[in-house]
């Protein structure tokens, strides 16, 4: 029997899409429900059964085993892995880690996903249990070493090993096989069948993992996964998470494949699965992580193979709008890959196509909140679904389209309602829109119609879906208008024209199978195989022979892998590349082998294009890669779409129809023609407004667009003819409340893109990895308009810095200028936070300001790092600048900024910065970030005019004020009495607050009278810190997504006595202010009685060497490193506090343990949750963390922390969290062991090689009395006042 059927299936969350190609006949396409247990057990098997019925012309009973003899290939994309990860439905497994790192996946990167949610929740670790193995290796040298080792020297020490990467590692502890066998047998006896093994530095030294894996197989584990096998890349956390993901998903995938294949009595000749990287893998070789973006990857391949015109080469943007979310991708002739991506709040290291997702789709719920129209991110899902589904669902984007006439009810089957036999419900949608319109009119004192409000919601939804497109294009230096938009997914056609218009895109391509494009992409995909080898080599042209040899070996491996999967040898194609970076950075660039083999020049050219600068540093090769593709079948090709368009346009006929429907467009109802796609002749044209419908989608052709019907596509092009109904102009005289959310999205998008630029172009780990930065835009008066959700402590303080610069430089700035500042008197928080401010000129005048603030780890001064425990006066803490021009007319003033940094080292006992190259590079990155903001604000003014943009900036600020006043009025009705609270720093200094709310106006006085005087120390807080604390707590308390800007503080009268700790004089030290801000926030929240205290600290932990020698005065070469540590979150009713995470004003990430050891001369010996440190209560406080670091050479360590005396308070009878503890372990006099010494909250200590420092951060307070009130519980445990 001839095998003449090729089936491609994409099993999505709601629908399973099927495309079957059969020789000699038209393709078979249809959809069926992904889950329908009443009618079939497995959707893909059912899809194949239906295909065979159609082809063979005979009935095949459901459930009968299928004969796949005629099926030449079966290709599948599946959400099985993603669903298992999201729903936690996977086989339990055990994690085996290096001893001391058992909690690495529990802690994660310590940043919280939702900045203003007091009920902090991070993704749970995937493993069920964990054991630590007493094995250990580390890297012998370190990147920051001013006296680097000679890696080419011979190795005589048996504990030193030169790895294939070129890196030398030291074995500190070898695997004890007998002990490990006992540990694994205990796990096996406990019922575990799957184990994940992840050891420190196994990406370059996998020997210990392989050793333990061999034992695991010997003792009977069925599934054994190692991190080096999963993905051998630097970063222990991400590699461990990826290993765990593979360990839990691989059994799920194997079972799924076995179940699928069990539905056949004769299997198809080939069964291949779609991988996240856009390639196919044979079912026997398909793994868990490869399945995570299986369906979306099919969509990217679909747009690339069906909508990218290989002749005209215009790049395309994929716009895949579904029910709950929208996926965005880009293709310019080459696929864009990511080496890691976040799925289900977990970072997975695995090559995947670059796909951005936004929580906005057809099922996104519509809200009217505080005078704003809000779309999502909540979704109605499939159940209950939109209101029109007759299941009691909420109003959604789909309902707005139905209400405005943009959906044709008769084109939907009658499958809705309790008995699944009713049409879409228009009546309930009308009633709900009238209800939400009345509410919105009440909030805004308007008299809008329901149609105007519904159209406003669609505008907001379109803007929300445009944001990821802007981030995919503009943020990377690509102009959106230079692209074609490819719309697919069930809902994309309704919004495609509007999205294109917002982005300035003139052409939209919609494939004939756009609602099944992922399945179509799967049908067009190639087999893929990738192999790479990690390296750590300084690039030089003399390495070309070595590189060629490594690539040749990898190419042979890739070819063998493809041929083993059945690829035809003649179809094999290879992409060879090096992954390269500048020394001391983490920004890698993949460099395809250039014709002249000068990888270095190619890298620098790509870096310059991507980031707009070069660095005067050596270049490092991170890895060599070979990716191969091949095909097992010969595929039919379609005519290039733009070629077909050119052929049709000149002879296009006007389509005819007798159907029409009223549609609400730009302020009025209009009769709009309806066309059935299957009845339109190829080569005809449709003028908008119109609707084109088929079995699976609706295309709304907006006014000013023409649709051309081609053999394989519908192409929508914007015409130059104005519609007879004039488009609504945006007035600068009066604010349209329907547009406020649209402008809020645009302003936020600009701030986000600034942040993306800063992270991508920065060099230091503080900004690039730990994300200790913020970006924002400001009005011409220096008032905050919008900031991306970065670091909360910067929220209210940056506007004070911009206002200071505005007043200082009024009338003196010119285009191309930029300023830098960090002084507390000019709106600074603490000196390491350097703020770069740029004016935005429009029509020759300053129209706005943009600013970026980044934490610089070394700014000179007395300490080993910028966060020094011992400082008493400001001059000791490093560079301090009230205002200074850093760029003049586009010229970077490097000499002046170097002189400013050098000046910081001229004071007694002070050193200049040890990392001036990093300082300069990061300042240039901040300038680049601002430049991105300048360009985007200029574009916005061109689109809407300057007066309109300024008007809506004021409108957004007024809206934030309205939301805060509304909240405070409601609170005052419930609690008319003043709100008071007091808390204490560890030295006994009180923080006191009284909040008096005016119930009529919603204004409030925040009075800090009674707060203690400024101290001879560094916990003094510039007044800008208090502003930040207030704006942050207000946003948390309002608990809805309101714009964060100047308007939030307009109702607030802030009174802080001068000379107090919260409004100090300019002479005192302030570097601990950002840590002290945690205590200010805790005190404000205590006054509102909202939650128990969180850790109240952000333990700033630093180490390094070099700087000015106190005896000789000579400045020695050196380096420093530092990080902030998370702790416990305070509980509140209905919520146990989260553990081991950053709280409130801080949200930086931690530095990965492997990165710490690769860069600095230390060992991370322990990183764990400090179990039991959270307060006990009805609702428990979260636990803190323990971070222990050992010196490998003589080093200076410092710790700056609080809550080492006063415990984080509990509420309503809940126990206080445990106070933090800082220890050093110094060798005893005999040298036989360690003496444990308590350091207190602030200390500097020099450690010899082998000595350790351990930081134990505080837990969070509990809420409500512990059950039984036993076990020594005392009243003072609630207050947190006991020492």
Swiss-Prot record:
Catalytic activity of the protein: 5-oxo-L-proline + ATP + 2 H2O = L-glutamate + ADP + phosphate + H(+)
Chain positions covered by the region annotation Disordered: 1256-1283
Alphabetized UniProt keyword annotations: ATP-binding, Hydrolase, Melanin biosynthesis, Nucleotide-binding
Listed InterPro entries: ACX-like_C, Hydant_A_N, Hydantoinase_A, Hydantoinase_B, Oxoprolinase-like
GO molecular function: 5-oxoprolinase (ATP-hydrolyzing) activity; ATP binding
Keyword ATP-binding attached: yes
Gene Ontology biological process terms in this record: glutathione metabolic process; melanin biosynthetic process
Keyword Metal-binding: no
Any one GO cellular component localisation term in the record: cytosol
EC number assigned by the record: 3.5.2.9
Cystine residue pairs: none
Deleted gene: phenotype: Does not affect the production of scytalone.
Biased composition (Basic and acidic residues): 1266-1277
Pfam families, A to Z: Hydant_A_C (PF19278), Hydant_A_N (PF05378), Hydantoinase_A (PF01968), Hydantoinase_B (PF02538)
Function: 5-oxoprolinase; part of the gene cluster that mediates the biosynthesis of dihydroxynaphthalene (DHN)-melanin, a bluish-green pigment forming a dark layer in the conidial wall that protects the conidia from UV radiations. The first step of the pathway is the production of the pentaketide 1,3,6,8-tetrahydroxynaphthalene (1,3,6,8-THN or T4HN) by the polyketide synthase PfmaE though condensation of acetyl-CoA with malonyl-CoA. T4HN is not stable and easily oxidizes into the stable form flaviolin. T4HN is also substrate of the hydroxynaphthalene reductase PfmaG to yield scytalone.
Family: Belongs to the oxoprolinase family.
Assembly notes: Homodimer.
Record-given protein name: 5-oxoprolinase PfmaA
Organism of origin: Pestalotiopsis fici (strain W106-1 / CGMCC3.15140)
Gene that this sequence comes from: PfmaA
